UniProtKB/Swiss-Prot annotation:
5-methyltetrahydropteroyltri-L-glutamate binds at residues 17-20, 117, 515-516, 561, 605. One of its GO terms (biological process) is methylation. Catalyzes the transfer of a methyl group from 5-methyltetrahydrofolate to homocysteine resulting in methionine formation. Keywords: Amino-acid biosynthesis, Metal-binding, Methionine biosynthesis, Methyltransferase, Repeat, Transferase, Zinc. The gene is metE. It comes from Escherichia coli O157:H7. Coiled coil: none annotated. This is 5-methyltetrahydropteroyltriglutamate--homocysteine methyltransferase. The lineage of its organism: Bacteria, Pseudomonadati, Pseudomonadota, Gammaproteobacteria, Enterobacterales. Pfam families: Meth_synt_1, Meth_synt_2. CDD domains: CIMS_C_terminal_like, CIMS_N_terminal_like.
Length: 753
């Protein structure tokens, strides 16, 4: 029984983000469709070859996407919203781009499909839309074309296909409501056709992804698996693939399916390998997801060997990445600025392929010497002074319940704040950032590259902050911000100023479409060596009599948008960050900053996949925020900002944050989000976003007034603030001025009654 290795998918964007550049060039009309397609072909060929050279036995095909793999699956099934269709009913790459971004070089612009987080990762997918009575047919043959491409290059391939039930689960019904699961029988013939085409090409195994099987699915959805897979069996061998959590709770459903193998995530799941082996049919192949596909740490291969060795020789076995390597940067070898010790702790996608090859060789031969050699740096890390800071660990251990409590309840604080700030009814503010103009980005880049000295850089930033204050005073806003000209990214900026973080040069991962992010890496205990935001906040406040908000990114968001350590809990990391930022709150307060905003946009997206695990996460997530904020005096007003569309199920936790003011994204939902705050009888102040900053459209005074009146029907007017949905970083100044002027005017009209 020879053990093979495989990956579940590989990063698409290219080492130098070639895909991003090709997409954006094509969208801008600067290159042809054929030039774009050629870049895709070149990247796929390179990535297959790189995986093969690293020792991967079975190469994934179908993991490449022009925008997103869920959207690719939608097109494969002929699921194109009416507003995005070509007049002749054909489907081409521009159809795909119209769904993803609302427009393409050809065809009529139309509202893009909704985008949301892929399970609990920082990748986003395009939500499939379902309407009653829609038809499905094979219309987009990208998967088959790419299989032909890989076979022509002589590769041993394993096509990757998103499974039918997970695809339906991820979608939403539009218009007249019906049960989307009722579409299952309509899409299965298309899946059968695709599998038949793959069988014709001599394909032995197909990886069929059903990550929905790690969720707490309703019984009707679990019951749908057996008839669905009865319909799909028989043409090729199916590797039922799950990830991001364990499968034990749904194992009875899984073991009844007519598939030939199962992939499990043994990194993020709590499944016991020996127990799985006992419960799976004896003729099934088990694909063990042992190498973490969504973090950057080198694996302790000796540990992985021990984890799996008891079932070697007892059943067909493959070793694999836990999930697609899509969530990992591509290649560590091009990182030239990391010091040797820290670099030796990491493994990016290509290094993870090498880890799989080493592990596979050792399991086949029984010789573990190479595993011990590979694992030595990560074992040595456990004792590194770069990792452990006794002062931080001591401070964390000394936290008491008192450290997460403000001195007084909201009602007492609100009175002190009213006396201090004397704000009018319907107070106006913005969320934090102002347009990041070319001048600002050039200034930061020149400084980073060493083309500009520190004095000239600081003079330039100071001028942009001064302009932001002047603009806001001219517009008549009540609570101002400094505009964040000095910040490249709301997480990276703080990571750069905290001990315990490192940064890469090319550690890009895809967020959605052409957007890539370069997350910081938490390598050790987190502390704050010096104040971070105080100087610029103090400078901005010195130029106006109106209050200027201090702006911090909250501990849970910094954690969720970074690559975390694996040797301590996420709770520990979040609380260490909270303690560091608690000192920042105290310093801002001492510098005369009376309103401090702590953004937590990621609080909800950090939720575990299983509801049964939510309470524990929310408990420490809320506690981290409160540790961060609780040092503030009664007359210091703490704001928080959150931007997502679902509050109902976590309202208790939102209230437990005990922020004096929460600003939220509500304009796109026409204030419907406020329903949860009304039903909960949310006690503190709320700023429902009155216009969508993701659109260049300027809202009218009347439109904003109408939204605010609607809000006042749900929340008492004396507790309402007036603000945009989100930061204004991505907007231009002309539309920003126009929109804010209308927003201020609407507030003034309401004050006059």
């Amino acid at each position: 029984m020879t053990i093979l290795n495989h990956t579940l998918g590989f990063p698409r964007v290219g080492l130098r983000r070639e895909l991003k550049k090709a997409q954006e060039s094509y969208w801008a009309g600067n290159s042809t469709r054929e030039e774009l397609l050629a870049v895709g072909r070149e990247l796929r060929a390179r990535h297959w070859d790189q995986q093969k050279q690293a020792g991967i036995d079975l190469l994934p095909v179908g993991d490449f996407a022009w925008y997103d793999h869920v959207l690719t699956t939608s097109l494969l099934l002929g699921n194109v919203p009416a507003r995005h269709q070509n007049k002749d009913g054909s489907v081409d790459i521009d159809t795909l781009f119209r769904i993803g971004r609302g427009r393409a070089p050809t065809g009529e612009p139309a509202a893009a499909a909704e985008m949301t987080k892929w399970f609990n990762t920082n990748y986003h997918y395009m939500v499939p839309e379902f309407v009653k009575g829609q038809q499905f047919k094979l219309t987009w043959t990208q998967l088959l074309d790419e299989v032909d491409e890989a076979l022509a290059l002589g590769h041993k391939v394993k096509p990757v296909l998103l499974g039918p039930i997970t695809w339906l689960w991820l979608g939403k019904v539009k218009g007249e409501q019906f049960d989307r699961l009722s579409l299952l029988n309509d899409i299965l013939p298309v899946y059968q056709q695709v599998l038949a085409e793959l069988a014709k090409r001599g394909i032995e195994w197909v990886q069929i992804d059903e990550p929905a099987l790690v969720l707490e699915l309703p019984q009707a959805w679990l019951d749908a698996y057996k008839p669905a897979y009865d319909a799909l069996q028989g043409q090729v061998k199916l590797l039922l693939t799950t990830y991001f959590e364990g499968v034990t709770p749904n194992l009875d459903t899984i073991t009844a399916l007519p598939v030939q193998g199962l992939h499990v995530d043994l990194v993020h799941g709590k499944d016991d390998v020996v127990e799985l082996h006992k419960r799976l049919p004896s003729d099934w192949l088990l694909s063990a997801g042992l190498i973490n596909g969504r973090n950057v740490w080198r694996a302790d291969l000796t540990e992985k060997y021990v984890q799996i060795k008891d079932i070697v020789g007892k059943r067909d076995l493959w070793v694999a990445s836990s999930c697609s390597l899509l969530h990992s940067p591509i290649d560590l070898s091009v990182e030239t600025r990391l010091d040797a010790e820290v670099k030796s702790w990491f493994a990016f996608a290509l290094q993870k392929c090498h880890e799989l090859a080493l592990l596979c060789d050792a399991l086949n031969s029984g010789d573990t010497a190479a595993l011990a050699e590979w694992s030595a740096p990560i074992q040595a890390r456990r004792h590194s002074t770069r990792v452990h800071n006794p002062a931080v660990e001591k401070r964390l251990a000394a936290i008491t319940a008192q450290d997460s409590q403000r001195a007084n309840v909201y009602e007492v604080r609100a009175e002190a704040q009213r006396a201090r700030f004397k704000l009018p009814a319907w107070p106006t503010t913005t969320i934090g950032s102002f347009p990041q103009t070319t001048e600002i980005r050039t200034l930061r880049l020149d400084f980073k590259k060493g083309n500009l000295d520190a004095n000239n850089y600081r003079t330039g930033i100071a001028e942009h902050i001064r302009q932001a204050i002047v603009e806001q005073e001219r517009l008549g806003l009540d609570v101002l911000v400094h505009g964040e000209a000095e910040r490249n990214d709301m997480v990276e900026y703080f990571g750069e100023h905290l001990d315990g973080f490192v940064f890469t040069q090319n550690g890009w991962v895809q967020s959605y479409g052409s957007r890539c992010v370069k997350p910081p890496i938490v390598i050790g205990d987190v502390s704050r060596p010096a104040p971070i935001t105080v100087e610029w906040a103090k400078y901005a406040q010195s130029m106006t009599d109106k209050p200027v908000k201090g702006m911090l990114t909250g501990p849970v968001t910094i954690l969720c948008w970074s690559f975390p350590r694996e040797d301590v809990s996420r709770e520990t990391i979040a609380k260490q960050i909270a303690l560091a930022l608690r000192d920042e709150v105290a310093d801002l307060e001492a510098a005369g900053i009376g309103i401090i905003q702590i953004d937590e946009p990621a609080l909800r997206e950090g939720l575990p996949l299983r509801r049964s695990d939510w309470d524990a996460y929310l408990q420490w997530g809320v506690e981290a925020f409160r540790i961060n904020a609780a040092v503030a005096k009664d007359d210091t007003q703490i704001h928080t900002h959150m931007c997502y569309c679902e509050f109902n199920d976590i309202m208790d936790s939102i209230a437990a944050l005990d922020a004096d003011v929460i600003t939220i994204e509500t304009s796109r939902s026409d204030m419907e989000l406020l329903e949860s705050f009304e039903e909960f009888d949310y006690p503190n102040e709320i700023g429902p976003g009155v216009y969508d900053i993701h659109s260049p459209n300027v809202p009218s005074v009347e439109w904003i007034e109408a939204l605010l009146k609607k809000a006042a029907k749900r929340i008492p007017a004396e507790r309402l603030w007036v603000n945009p949905d989100c930061g204004l970083k991505t907007r231009g100044w002309p539309e920003t001025r126009a929109a804010l002027a209308n927003m201020v005017q609407a507030a003034q009209n309401l004050r006059r009654g």
